[in-house]
């Protein structure tokens, strides 16, 4: 199991290790993550369509989380969002290299020509995040279920609470987005 931690450059948790041992990767859509981030840097309209749907944790790749955080900070501060401002914000945050550097940002903007379908793509990213969240919660519940000292009713409450958090967070974002349309 120690060897698996060294193989995957993406942050590894118990759920990821379990899935890798079973030959499964966690649900993800890296190509769509790249397309959404690239579109957000080339078209302001794309930012407006996505900013209420996604959060940094929705991205599977850590570099993408950092890039989205920088875009979100620029958006919150009412600053222009483009390749140069995102790069500058990442530098300011000390995360440019963690995000893949300037070359990676350029690659993201070159992979996409418009923000067409960005909302649809961001909803797929959100669905993959929800799937990963459910897998993580389920794995934690399974692990705790084997612990004889765990009170079963406390475990049920904990499971219900965690599932409710996933549901509420995503229903809220979906309804806010629907109202803005």
Explain the meaning of each model-derived region.
Residues 1-130:
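Noncatalytic partner-interaction/assembly domains of nucleic-acid and motor enzyme complexes
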